[in-house]
Amino acid sequence: MSRSVLQPSQQKLAEKLTILNDRGVGMLTRLYNIKKACGDPKAKPSYLIDKNLESAVKFIVRKFPAVETRNNNQQLAQLQKEKSEILKNLALYYFTFVDVMEFKDHVCDLLNTIDVCQVFFDITVNFDLTKNYLDLTVTYTTLMILLSRIEERKAIIGLYNYAHEMTHGASDREYPRLGQMIVDYEHPLKKMMEEFVPHSKSLSDALISLQMVYPRRNLSADQWRNAQLLSLISAPSTMLNPAQSDTMPCEYLSLDAMEKWIIFGFILCHGMLNTEATALNLWKLALQSSSCLSLFRDEVFHIHKAAEDLFVNIRGYNKRINDIRECKEAAVSHAGSMHRERRKFLRSALKELATVLSDQPGLLGPKALFVFMALSFARDEIIWLLRHADNMPKKSADDFIDKHIAELIFYMEELRAHVRKYGPVMQRYYVQYLSGFDAVVLNELVQNLSVCPEDESIIMSSFVNTMTSLSVKQVEDGEVFDFRGMRLDWFRLQAYTSVSKASLSLADHRELGKMMNTIIFHTKMVDSLVEMLVETSDLSIFCFYSRAFEKMFQQCLELPSQSRYSIAFPLLCTHFMSCTHELCPEERHHIGDRSLSLCNMFLDEMAKQARNLITDICTEQCTLSDQLLPKHCAKTISQAVNKKSKKQTGKKGEPEREKPGVESMRKNRLVVTNLDKLHTALSELCFSINYVPNMAVWEHTFTPREYLTSHLEIRFTKSIVGMTMYNQATQEIAKPSELLTSVREYMTVLQSIENYVQIDITRVFNNVLLQQTQHLDSHGEPTITSLYTNWYLETLLRQVSNGHIAYFPAMKAFVNLPTENELTFNAEEYSDISEMRSLSELLGPYGMKFLSESLMWHISSQVAELKKLVVENVDVLTQMRTSFDKPDQMAALFKRLSSVDSVLKRMTIIGVILSFRSLAQEALRDVLSYHIPFLVSSIEDFKDHIPRETDMKVAMNVYELSSAAGLPCEIDPALVVALSSQKSENISPEEEYKIACLLMVFVAVSLPTLASNVMSQYSPAIEGHCNNIHCLAKAINQIAAALFTIHKGSIEDRLKEFLALASSSLLKIGQETDKTTTRNRESVYLLLDMIVQESPFLTMDLLESCFPYVLLRNAYHAVYKQSVTSSA
């Protein structure tokens, strides 16, 4: 046959192999999706499960591929109604099967052409040609097997064709051939064994060329270890030498792919197993390595059973069947342990490789081959484990459960990251290699060729010229390289020189083939690093093994030593989109969503695990910190005092209590505490969370650290509220000082997280603690501000109103009074200076402002009630206001007054609330003076230098600022706001003002009644009265200031009027002779002094003019004398 008849360039073998292989993967993707859709009741075409069409579908399948529409009108009647919808909805399925048929036709044509051309195949010489030929054979075989696994194929094709027949009056033109193909390939491998008889020579030649490559790749871990495979440091003297091989692309060729070539290849040309020992050896070695092969994604092929079923009907194949059974036994017994040991070796090898390259990234140049070999080896082992995990024999289950798989995946990801990061380093190296070495060697080889036709010579020369023109400056300038044309030309050249009649035969010039294969690898190191990473380390198959994927992740988190590698699982989600194909765009969204949901789940679980560890550490630290609280030293002090006084207490031999801090004393470094374990586990997990700042998954960016930050915020919020230990039923709550200690411990632990992860923990504190200063947090949950505000108002101050607690000015605290029913809490432990300061630290200015507003709301409700009482007595009070100098008339009018005790009680309650508020404000001022002294001093200057002529609105703004900083003000802005909201629309401002004036009158004339109360006795020790009437001083001054600010009256004048009325009323009880009514007269006199002392508007001179100072002096003398007498 002349060269012109079958000219290689005209056959376009390279182009056809490239296109058909790509199209084959696309067809596999489409068939796979059809199979999965038909297997899912939710996604299955509705016509296949429609009860009305059930009989029609059964009829069509039974008669398939024949078409009979005339005599079966009853069975096909329903089909007639839905024919248009069937045509529309099943078209995609039907034409996918048509495309498969056309693909089959093209493949058969190409295989025949290759046979006619008598193409020479050798994986070590014409690598691209041989690999693509074997890939096409396997893709074609896989496609036909997958087609035969779609059980509904006949129903789909038949339904569509019947609908077409009913609509157009004739079958679809592709139907006869398609129907016959479906029938012919009912048992695909059996049919293909017949079909491949003429192709046996070409296929067996290609497969036998693997005899040097496959056995060398399929070695045990011990052999790898002895050869020090993938080690850069085993021979330091050669560390900088480039990693070279005569078969460069074969070194990282997938073992999984080679096993598929060998298994399927020798099934199709099984005659070679009887005549060729090399073929039999390859076949047996492959059979011993696996129990199943991956057809496509998660579709597997059980090789031993299938091969045995095919060979059992062939005469003279008993020996081959025995071989299969022996190999199956070997695979079941030894394959699991062999692959387990390989994974173990690869973990250490990849770790060493990644560590060395991270320290010396320049070695990525000469040792790039090692990186891609390592990635390919590891990927093969992971995929092997994945497909065998669900198909494992029970007796060796442990070999198929690898709890350390995360470590292997992690080091793969680390190597991938090195390649991406240091791509320019590799580019510089290989650009120089190509121009300075490869171009020279190739030029010499071309020059020494005895025969070189014109076409081949032109291609060779273009190779040399392309490489010679390269320079490092192109890399430095960021130029984009593209050697795809050069690689395709080499593929074409392989096709031209591998046919039997070629002038330049590649079989006779093997050195040229090996050199060009090496050059092609070098070009890929310059322009196709990302594609190389996909080729050697793509693990998108995990997308289709979701359950196994999640199980591996959970095992990784459960094992503390492996949790540092858990980031490998979210990183794998970035691979998923590489398994999509342009021939099946509809699955992109589904796979993208799966990658996003899995990545989100993994990162969320990692953050939760870290959060739980942090919470446990915080709990431990809070427990240790709690041991240092002052309350726990009482027993130690007691023991010391008893020891000093030589008192024998307790039983002999009582064990001495461990002192706080004893846990830090280590006698043996091997002793590991629970806290040590928690810190170790946390550091491991945080390494993983901190490993990458962010990752891109299907056009979304994930930031692992933000997951942790978010979880820490939520947990910190819950913990703070939880640590208050608020019990609504028993009204118990933690002391502010103890909560503050716990919160500070919590914050200390959280701050230490910054040593592990680069997160802004200050942001967490700001977000959480600022929310805790509000009534509700961002989730609508109660905060410590609302809990403590509620407790102080509803529990502590309510008990004060009930007479169980008194405010002691001398101690600046509320103290329990001895009563029949003991309270469940000690008021002093919640209201002394240190507790109020702790409360201010926790709630901050915002929280304390909310507390103040809540207090003022209670005061305003009391004032509203007082106004009602004033309105009831308005006529009497109006007369009393002008008759204070007429004793007899005042006495008569006073008897007409109602609710005198109620007025005093309500004013006392107001005074108690204001006293509590003054404690809170003082504590807030102390806290802010410590934290922001300069700002507080500036606010003080503002407040202290308000000119008297200043507009009241401006003054109130300054007072509001001062009050927020905890500074005392002449007029309380919060009280003014609270009382302003009480203005009634039905009452005129003049009437409101009159009621306010009369309220002060009512209080003034009611004071003498306090003298008859037993509890009104003044106690010098507490500087107050046990019934809290000393709080009236604060109530009178603050209420007067607020009311007359609102009504724009003179505060000073009204207080003078009050002082005149009060002193006149009190002087009258000095003349009383009834001991009951004057029981505590002196103690009540002191109220006048307290009112003046408390007021910024009244002076002692003014008091002297109304009430003789001698009376006050005598009163003080009397109460102090009485106090000494009663204490004695």
UniProtKB/Swiss-Prot annotation:
Compartments where found: Cell membrane; Cell projection, Lamellipodium membrane
Topological category with respect to the lipid bilayer: Single-pass membrane protein
Lineage: Eukaryota, Metazoa, Chordata, Craniata, Vertebrata
Record-annotated membrane-spanning stretches: 995-1015
Organism: Rattus norvegicus
InterPro entries noted in UniProt: Nck-associated_protein-1
Role played: Part of the WAVE complex that regulates lamellipodia formation. The WAVE complex regulates actin filament reorganization via its interaction with the Arp2/3 complex. Actin remodeling activity is regulated by RAC1. As component of the WAVE1 complex, required for BDNF-NTRK2 endocytic trafficking and signaling from early endosomes.
Gene: Nckap1
Chain positions covered by the region annotation Disordered: 640-665
Expression across tissues: Preferentially expressed in brain, heart, liver and testis.
Protein name: Nck-associated protein 1
Family the entry assigns: Belongs to the HEM-1/HEM-2 family.
Keyword Membrane recorded: yes
Oligomeric and partner information: Component of the WAVE1 complex composed of ABI2, CYFIP1 or CYFIP2, BRK1, NCKAP1 and WASF1/WAVE1. Within the complex, a heterodimer containing NCKAP1 and CYFIP1 interacts with a heterotrimer formed by WAVE1, ABI2 and BRK1. Component of the WAVE2 complex composed of ABI1, CYFIP1/SRA1, NCKAP1/NAP1 and WASF2/WAVE2. CYFIP2 binds to activated RAC1 which causes the complex to dissociate, releasing activated WASF1. The complex can also be activated by NCK1. Associates preferentially with the first SH3 domain of NCK. Interacts with NYAP1, NYAP2 and MYO16. Interacts with TMEM132D.
